[in-house]
């Protein structure tokens, strides 16, 4: 019957909870960025320290995205999802207890471990729960809350709370929702049939995952997108406060454009790529992202800063959703969605979310924070060159071109 062929009720409950969960990952990860100008005064941090604080989480995230993705393909989604969510929520609260750079780096590194394990596992769980016709839509919806919670609501919430409480208590407050959601996920999420007795037959070595041309290209493309957007996300608040001399409220308002633009981009672009094609949308997004990052660097008024940053991040964050969502899923061997996504996300995080902010912090410290925008721009331009070699995999686009449509990579069909 209809219910036996597809459980839509479970699909929407699971996707809703996983969407909220990934939004909280974004909030817990990025709430620190608008707090850094205030924290820097209390903890005596400089731009290099700020870049390192952002980078250490990205490096740990990258390594454990690779490990966690493969682990959840073997032992099950819930055994990775629930402990990871509890851990990163608690560690976000512990960030408020840091009394210096070393303790903050340690807390954020361990937080990156848990968030890295959660990320590809949550994408695979959304993929498991989604009807194939809604897979791209659901993955786009899920990933769109990362910038919405972390980079749109986060700066506004943080800068407004600072009027009443210290930055330490801001971290404590944002940790609570994740603990509640972990309980709801534990009650709701089911394991996919592919984790049963056929698991050992279906799994392939890493070399099999890398055989599809789009996997190594997606790794490079994600590095470029993350190097651009995470450099902006980490250092734009300090650029606005220190270089353009904006106050806390103005800085929070402009910085929120990163999140609102990213939310819309991750919500819209994966679906657009179903029609226009993965390759076309990816290349065009890198080009337009670079154009608007350049425009942001030339802007000085609040309206121009907000508008150019919003549109630039629409394309940049849309790239993150597109590369780690449908492009990764359609390049994955049968039954290895989480593992393949983990490799792509992990490599992108290590270099784009880890190494790039360290370099950006050094650039800001040595040459001036305004030059970090040039670094983001160069990364996006390189992304145009990389994605020009992608192979088209969108089923509707292939059908429109009269090309053969490959069978779905996911083991459930």
Q: What is each PLM-predicted segment?
A:
Residues 276-326:
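C-terminal transmembrane helical hairpin of 12-TM major facilitator-type secondary transporters
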Residues 142-187:
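Helix-loop-helix hairpin linking two adjacent transmembrane segments in secondary transporters
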Residues 44, 76, 97-103, 245, ...:
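Helix-breaking motifs and short loop linkers at transmembrane-helix boundaries and internal kinks
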Residues 107-147:
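Cytoplasmic helix-loop-helix junction between adjacent transmembrane helices
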Residues 137-155, 345-356:
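Glycine-rich segments within core transmembrane alpha-helices of 12-TM secondary carriers
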Residues 63-99, 273-279:
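Conserved MFS/SLC helix-loop-helix module at the cytosolic interface between two early adjacent transmembrane helices
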Residues 32-33, 214-266, 320, 325, ...:
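Extracytoplasmic gate region of multi-pass secondary transporters
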Residues 2-8, 192-219, 406-408:
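Juxtamembrane intracellular "pre-TM" segments in multi-pass secondary transporters
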């Amino acid at each position: 019957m209809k219910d036996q062929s597809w459980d839509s009720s479970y699909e929407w409950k699971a996707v809703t909870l996983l969407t909220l969960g990934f939004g909280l990952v974004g909030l817990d990860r990025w709430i620190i960025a608008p707090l850094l100008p205030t924290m820097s005064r209390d903890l005596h941090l400089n731009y290099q320290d700020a870049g390192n604080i952002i980078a250490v989480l990205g490096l740990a995230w990258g390594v454990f995205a690779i490990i966690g993705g493969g682990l959840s393909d073997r032992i099950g989604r819930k055994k990775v999802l629930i402990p990871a969510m509890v851990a990163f929520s608690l560690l976000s609260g512990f960030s408020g207890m840091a009394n210096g750079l070393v303790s903050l780096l340690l807390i954020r590194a361990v937080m990156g471990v848990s968030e890295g394990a959660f990320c590809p596992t949550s994408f695979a769980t959304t993929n498991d729960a989604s009807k194939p016709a809604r897979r791209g839509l659901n993955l786009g919806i899920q990933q769109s809350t990362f910038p919405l919670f972390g980079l749109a609501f986060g700066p506004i919430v943080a800068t407004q709370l600072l009027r009443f409480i210290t930055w330490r208590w801001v971290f404590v407050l944002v940790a609570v929702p994740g603990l509640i959601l972990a309980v709801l996920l534990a009650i709701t999420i089911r394991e996919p049939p592919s984790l049963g007795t056929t698991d050992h037959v279906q799994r392939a070595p890493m070399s099999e995952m890398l055989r599809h041309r789009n996997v190594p290209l997606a790794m490079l493309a994600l590095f470029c997108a993350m190097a651009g957007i995470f450099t902006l996300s980490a250092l734009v608040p300090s650029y606005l406060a220190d270089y353009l001399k904006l106050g806390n409220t103005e800085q929070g308002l402009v910085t929120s454009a990163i999140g609102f633009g990213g939310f819309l981009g991750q919500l819209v672009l994966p679906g657009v790529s179903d029609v226009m094609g993965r390759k076309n949308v990816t290349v065009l997004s890198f080009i337009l992202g670079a154009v608007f990052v350049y425009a942001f660097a030339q802007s000085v008024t609040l309206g121009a800063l907000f508008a150019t940053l919003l549109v630039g991040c629409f394309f940049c964050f849309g790239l993150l959703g597109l590369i780690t969502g449908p492009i990764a899923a359609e390049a994955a061997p049968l039954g290895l969605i989480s593992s393949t996504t983990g490799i792509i996300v992990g490599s992108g995080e290590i270099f784009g979310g880890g190494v790039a902010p360290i370099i950006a912090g050094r650039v800001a410290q040595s040459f001036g924070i305004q030059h970090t925008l040039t670094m983001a721009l160069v990364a996006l331009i390189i992304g145009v060159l990389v994605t020009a070699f992608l192979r088209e995999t969108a089923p509707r686009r292939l059908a429109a071109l009269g090309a053969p449509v490959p069978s779905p990579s996911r083991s459930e069909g």
